[in-house]
Amino acid sequence: MHKYLTFILLLFCYACAENQSATTTNSNAYAQNFSIEKTAEGTVLAVKNPWPNSTLQYRYLLLSPNTQAPKDSSSYTQIIRKPLSRIVVTATPQVTALELLGQVEAIVGFPQPQFVSNANFRNSLEQNKIAAIGNNQQLDVERILQLKPDVFFGFGVSDNHNALEQLKKAGIPVLWIADWTERHPLGRAEWIRFFAPFFQKENLADSLFKTIASEYNSLQKQLDTLKTRPTVMAGAIYQDVWYLPGGGSYLGQLFKDAKADYLWKDTEITGSISSSAEQVLLKAQNADFWFAPAHYTSYPQLKNDGNLYQRFEAFAHQKIYTYNKSLGPSGGTLFFETGPYQPHLLLKDIVYWIHPGVIDAYTPYYFKPLDDE
């Protein structure tokens, strides 16, 4: 009897080991909104929080060309064959991720492509290899269907989108990209690992992200010895409301990691905060630095929009910085296009301006002071 029980126990342990080896989860270091699992059926990519306050989760099964699809696919949102060769993307950071992986040539469609700055993308556009597909609010479904993409990488604020339903019914897989809802700058950049399996570029993506994270964390550690934390404010007025990043937001995290005392750091808001100009003045009139003043790029612009802006110390001492330093050929702001996948440079820029002397021989790429005229 003892031998029989031992044999059963060994079989059970073996079965558990087999089951564990059949599924391997590639853990993320920072990203919260996607996961990758290697299973017996294939690579499973899960996406959650594709837009703020979403409770939905999507599961995509990625298969090799000759792999048979599972008989029961009810647990998957879509089944996709790799590697992809024809894709439609819908946001400029997605182009940057594909550029890093060397896969821009796979793009065949984009909404309002004239505003993309990436050189390889624009070269393909000039050769008519990339088609305009309307805009994100009104997609040209007929044109997308003509392109016959392997996958449509979506970006939006809800899944209530008639055009995307039409694509699904036509057999085109629609995948939601949630890099933009990540709170940590490195979390956004880590989404390069999500794109990689579609092109069998996992090793490259891991190497690229490791380098980005290493540079970011090394600079952050370098700042640990600083004894002062300059105060920082952000944002500007739009239609009588002052919009500024919440303490739990992407920019809020960058300010924190740059060892700045962001004056709204205690808020848990992950998006933007809506405030009155008077409240902002009361809280931040004496702030040392002012970042991301919306569309403003010069002091005369701020001055012409009323006297209130001039009452801030950052205005008086000319310590206001715009993210419009680097622009693309058509005027697109690279802060939005490439910044999400270059967080180490965003951090470096902020540190350069608020902690003079900490970084030597560096030219900021994204942030610059407002122009004098």
Located regions from the model:
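Flexible, glycine-rich surface segments
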Residues: 219-306
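Bacterial Sec-exported substrate-binding components of ABC uptake systems
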Residues: 16-95, 204-233, 316, 353, ...
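A short, structured surface patch at a secondary-structure boundary
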Residues: 52-56, 60-145, 151-156
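Stable alpha-helical elements in mature extracytoplasmic
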Residues: 83, 93-97, 103, 140, ...
